[in-house]
């Protein structure tokens, strides 16, 4: 059985959602980033991590792709043009849109208050709007 390491209100939810979609049982070990529990699975303390037998995998997108490939579901076959297009869109979403959302989160609640720059949010909103148009054009 898989083991998912990470808080529910984190990117660990992506992994748990993927496992639910695949119909795969899993154990959830709730813990926050940089916690002692998280560091047992990833020395940096970043979450999520997935334990599959003796293997520990990290990074939510890599974990989801691993699971899709392992179970031959929810993805195009590796080495096909369809998979290359899927990967291109996935990586673009992570690089462009998720990065903007993460920057907004850091300046809203992740960083200590004295490190937050609230003024950045207007530029992030504008960049997200441009990326949304770009996404619409891609689809």
Where are these regions (language model features)?
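GST-like domain detector, emphasizing the conserved glutathione-binding G-site
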Residues: 1-119, 126
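Amphipathic alpha-helical packing segments from all-alpha helical-bundle domains
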Residues: 120-138
